[in-house]
Amino acid sequence: MSEKSVEAAAELSAKDLKEKKDKVEEKAGRKERKKEVVEEEENGAEEEEEETAEDGEDDDEGDEEDEEEEEEEDEGPVRKRTAEEEDEADPKRQKTENGASA
């Protein structure tokens, strides 16, 4: 019986070692991917800073102007859609306003 116990213990330890090795490799792979993502984010941030520096504008001023332009763009189509949606969504109301019964 002692031989079987020794063999079983050796098999378990080999399995355990393999599992641990796999886990270590997985962790190393995750760390490498995270490192790559961080590097990409840092590189992207550096490129943005370079672009704004080339424009000669402060970040604050440019952002405010961009926000104003976006708001103006958003307001136009939203108002049109709202009026169209009201006309389509409430046909009974149109009929009563036009003199027809609902």
Swiss-Prot record:
Residues with Phosphoserine modification: S2, S5, S13
GO biological process annotation, one example: positive regulation of transcription by RNA polymerase II
Keywords associated with the record: Acetylation, Immunity, Phosphoprotein, Zinc
Tree of life domain: Eukaryota
Phylogenetic lineage: Eukaryota, Metazoa, Chordata, Craniata, Vertebrata
Protein source organism: Rattus norvegicus
Gene from which this protein is expressed: Ptms
Region span, Disordered: 1-102
Basic and acidic residues bias locations: 13-37
GO MF, one example: histone binding
Keyword Phosphoprotein: yes
The protein, known as: Parathymosin
Keyword GTP-binding assigned: no
